[in-house]
Amino acid sequence: MPNWAFGYVSVTGTRDGIKSFIERFVSEDDPSTIPGKRYFARSFISSKRQEFIDEAMSEFSEPAVDAKASYSFVASFAWSAYSCLIAGYPQNFHSECLTLSEACAEDGVSVTIQTSEPGICFEEHITCDDTGTVEHTEKDLLAYKCRHCGEITSFASFEDPDDQECPECGNCEFDRCEEV
């Protein structure tokens, strides 16, 4: 059973571009991928594909076909977004899967992805523009100590510790610490 990276995907583009990009994620639909369409390996959305597409289309205020908008959603990745979208799975299953770079260039979208992998305690930040240029950074999660029970837990830099609960006691007050 792999560790999971969970995070936020923000995609900017035209209606057709965003729709195509969302269609590349494995979903709860049956079938879970669109037959004949290359998809993101081990990259999941936790809902029916059309629900995400309908929500994304509601972000467009202009009726013009070439109008652009942004849409953000939650996704999960087996091991890491890097291994699912950049290097690893896509190369091993190239006839079925594609890289983030290929998808952004084909769909004409730009993307920002932030993930947190709490099992191995790292976070990722990935950007890809509509030409397929990818930038990826990763770093250790930040450690916090619960003020109530002393439990050490980790959060990503994009997560607000005031919005988190201690996995041990459920308290919501933390202090930054150096321990992991």
Give the label of every model feature segment.
Residues 155-165:
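Short linker/helix segments within small regulatory modules
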Residues 25-28, 34-150, 178-180:
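Charged interaction segments
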Residues 145, 165-168:
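The −1 position to Zn-ligating cysteines in a subset of zinc-ribbon hairpins
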Residues 2-4, 66-68, 159:
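Short coil/turn motifs at beta-sheet boundaries
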Residues 1-33:
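Short, extreme N-terminal segment that most often corresponds to the first beta-strand
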Residues 154, 173-177:
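Short functional micro-motifs and their immediate structural scaffolds
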Residues 150, 170-173:
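Cys/His-coordinated zinc-binding microdomains
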